[in-house]
Swiss-Prot record:
Molecular function in Gene Ontology: GTP binding; GTPase activity; ribosome binding; translation elongation factor activity
Organism whose genome encodes this protein: Alkaliphilus metalliredigens (strain QYMF)
Record GO cellular component, one term: plasma membrane
Gene expressing this chain: lepA
Membrane topology per record: Peripheral membrane protein
Protein name: Elongation factor 4
Length: 602
């Protein structure tokens, strides 16, 4: 049974597809409960990274406590945990849902249910959460709330008859949402007297307090001065501060079962406070840790190098700092003949990779070069040994390879039916295999495909959006590995291989990719005093070539008329000089050339 204190607590998060109005609804709830006055209000209050506001997306989950006076005259504590919507950040969503009893499902009144909405709903159902559907953007002329209600009931199977119809932008019917939270989301019921058990669902590094952990107290109580133990690492610390965010940090005496807040304990090393860990009382520990999060596996790898070699340690420090609150980022040191010392980093997807790169550049003032993104391939060698390859440079020679397998994803693509043909064409072009197709209603269709992850990570999402005028939506999950005819494509500049530009590609696309890279490099590398050949090769076979023409001095400028043999002699002399220069000269590849080639459309 919930205690009197717990009866007043509601822990919930907001889930939705990108752009369905999740952060705007969070802003309105904050405003309506009087937490921030309209004067201090700024759009996307919970998106406190500059990058999040700029891109209009939520990247990191945030938590905040609201106090709401309900119609029954009681004050309720509502702990809102904001979640991202992009497919790359599904792990952030699963983390925040683990700390809640309920979720608000925001659906756009014009767009309806999309692929990512479905994926997040399934995550919430797995955690046995109470889901409240809310239909947003009813102020739009194209809004069709009644149809959307039917869609929610038919596709997800949730009763949407009492779903609040709101406009988060205009602040319409926001009270209905708050009342629905109080009425429908169950209060926490855990035991306050049991030994402490708290779930770390996020953390960040503070220069003064050390690592600060966002936690949901599941059982027991945590107070200042108490000795706590991290169950995964067995490390012990003394709590220096506990409190809640409302919206800034507010210190409290204690956090008890059902509360969502933060704990600071002068933890200096980010590795000791892992997201998904359980915090317990060091003197009276709980027997079992909470069921941890599944460890997230990176899907995409790329090399990250400092533009100036001496900044190597700074990059390591920055990656360490980012890793504390981004459980999905993994990295290890590597070296490249072309770029020097750097790191091989693993990400969840291309958006995640871009975000990390931008955060490194902005928050830590680093100048970086990144190599082409690649996925993990499984290679069976002729001697039966199986190796996982994440860096194309480590691929064994062709003679040693028996089979190369590439990762395959199970993709669900939702599109308006008039775009189905274009999307099927796109999937076929990306070597997709159709597994099924069903109509949700007359106007929308659900396509089920198996696609190579290599084809999805580059620009599949962008291509899908542009071909469906923004209406297509995608959700995917790993399925496994499948044998494929893949080759390693090397780029040679002035007959020297540049390891940072090597990548693994399907045989059918090797020529187009190789030719595209040579053409792009030709535009980007400045001309030298000698001709520079640019070649794309598979093993020893050259499949594409471009030549950067030499800069030439006009050696005939001072020959006015005169004997032809004199001119020939001067030209011959110049030719010999160029030949000698080509043998000893080295070609500088500017950083801009690396960047533009790696952004090459695939």
């Amino acid at each position: 049974m919930p205690s009197d204190r717990q009866r007043k607590i509601r822990n919930f998060s907001i889930i939705a597809h990108i752009d369905h109005g999740k952060s705007t609804l969070a802003d309105r709830l904050i405003e309506r409960t009087g937490l921030i006055s309209q004067r201090e209000m700024q759009a996307q209050v919970l998106d406190n990274m500059e990058l999040e506001r700029e891109r209009g997306i939520t990247i990191k989950l945030q938590s905040i406590r609201l106090i709401y006076k309900a119609k029954d005259g009681q004050d309720y504590y509502l702990n809102l945990i904001d979640t991202p919507g992009h497919v790359d950040f599904t792990y952030e969503v699963s983390r925040s849902l683990a700390a809640c009893e309920g979720a608000i499902l925001v659906v756009d009144a014009a767009q309806g249910i999309e692929a990512q909405t479905m994926a997040n709903v399934y995550l919430a159902l797995e955690q046995n959460l109470e889901i409240i559907p809310v239909i947003n953007k009813i102020d739009l002329p194209s809004a069709r709330p009644d149809e959307i209600k039917r869609e929610i009931e038919d596709i997800i199977g949730l009763d949407a008859s009492e779903a609040p119809l709101i406009s988060a932008k205009d602040g319409l019917n926001i009270d209905d949402v708050l009342e629905a939270i109080v009425k429908n989301i169950p209060p926490p019921t855990e035991d306050e007297e049991a030994p402490l058990k708290a779930l770390v669902f996020d953390s960040y590094y503070d220069n003064y307090k050390g690592v600060v952990a966002y936690t949901r107290v599941v059982e027991g109580t945590v107070k200042k001065g108490m000795k706590i133990r991290m169950m995964a690492t067995k490390k012990e610390f003394e709590v220096t501060e506990v409190g809640v965010y409302s919206p800034g940090p507010i210190q409290l005496d204690q956090l008890s079962a059902g509360d969502v807040g933060y704990i600071a304990a002068s933890i200096k090393d980010v590795r000791y406070c892992r997201v998904g860990d359980t915090i317990t009382d060091a003197l009276n520990p709980t027997e079992h840790s909470l069921p941890g999060y599944r460890k997230v596996t990176p899907m995409v790898y790329c090399g990250v190098y400092p533009a100036e070699g001496e900044k190597y340690e700074d990059v390591r420090d920055a990656l360490d700092r980012l890793q504390v609150n981004d459980a999905a980022l993994v990295f290890e040191a590597e070296t490249s003949a072309a770029l020097g010392f750097g790191f091989r980093c693993g990400f969840l997807g291309l958006l995640h990779m871009e975000i990390i790169q931008e955060r490194l550049e902005r928050e830590f003032n680093l100048d970086l070069v990144t190599t082409a993104p690649s996925v993990i391939y499984r290679v069976t060698k002729t001697n039966g040994e199986v190796v996982m390859i994440q860096n194309p440079a480590n691929l064994p020679v062709t003679q040693e390879i028996s089979v190369i397998e590439e990762p395959i994803v199970k993709a669900t693509i939702m599109v308006p039916s008039e775009y189905a043909g274009i999307v099927i064409e796109l999937c076929q072009d990306r070597r997709g295999e159709m597994k099924g197709m069903d109509y949700i209603e007359e106007t929308r269709v659900n396509l089920h495909y198996e696609l190579p992850l290599n084809e999805v990570i580059y620009d599949f999402f962008d291509a899908l959006k542009s071909k469906t005028k923004g209406y297509g939506s995608l959700d995917y999950e790993m399925k496994g590995y499948k044998p494929s005819t893949l080759v390693k494509l090397d780029i040679l500049i002035n007959s020297e291989q540049v390891d940072a530009l090597s990548f693994i590609v399907h045989e059918s696309k090797a020529y187009a990719r190789g030719k595209g890279m040579c053409e792009k490099l030709k535009d980007e590398i400045p001309r030298h005093q000698f001709p520079v050949p640019l070649q794309a090769s598979i093993g020893t076979k050259i499949i594409a070539r471009e030549t950067i023409r030499a800069l030439r001095k006009d050696v005939l400028a001072k020959c006015y008329g005169g004997d032809i043999s004199r001119k020939k002699k001067l030209l011959e002399k110049q030719k010999k000089g160029k030949k000698r220069m080509r043998q000893v000269g080295s070609v500088e590849v500017p950083q801009k050339a690396f960047m533009s080639v790696l952004k090459l459309d695939t």
